[in-house]
Amino acid sequence: MTGPDGPASTTDAPAVPSLDVDHLTVRFAGLLALDDVTFTVRPGTVHALIGPNGAGKSTCFNVLSGVYRATSGSVRFGEHELTGMSPHRIAGLGVARIFQNLALPPHATVEDSLLLGRHRLTRTGFVAAGLRLPSAAREERAHRARVREIAEFVGLAEHLTRPAGSLSYGQQKLAELARALCMEPRLLLLDEPVAGMTADERRRVAAVIAGVRDSLGISIVLVEHDMGVVMRLADTVTVLDFGRLIADGAPVDVQNDPEVVRAYLGAEATP
């Protein structure tokens, strides 16, 4: 049931581990995209990854999700070494990524779009599903019930029967987040989740993200250019500039770091 503590998971997922990025280096044809980057995402926290354009944020996200392979260094999610794993295998460990661009099937209902997130949790075989055996019907009912719980959690319960493409932009971004939550993730990678939104939409999505951390205990790595959202949500902030880590710590400390000020404003750092 959905309540003040959010929708409890219907799976027996193991505890959320830390994500440890250790001396991560990525080179592309001589270009150093990431240079010996090290940071740790503590379990159940929001960890913002920020920096000017070209700082290496997208490259880092692509390594974390298995799209790119690191030249050297490691990425560990608990006991699992992610470096070199395929995106599919990483997703199977409970890592879900939401891209900046919308990817909902526009003509499918919101409920069916969210149901796609349950795919990796489906145990019924193709034959049983095709024949509509009782086991398949029971599993589908359970998945749809979970979808409705998560839709309620993000504020989309009244829109489940609408085509996903008919939602407002902010609602579609919430639907993307809900679909990722339907995967029962332990780690969420959010790529600019409030980009292009109105102020009201940004506040709403930020509140849902905070609820994911506070109610569900899911770790979140957040790439976002809206510094107001970053400072409100993040427990820890890592700052990249030209592929190098220049700051890592609490938001208030990072915000006042001279190296960060210089990277963003081009001003001379003061002693």
Sequence positions of predicted segments:
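Glycine-rich phosphate-binding loops of nucleotide-dependent enzymes
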Residues: 2-7, 12-271
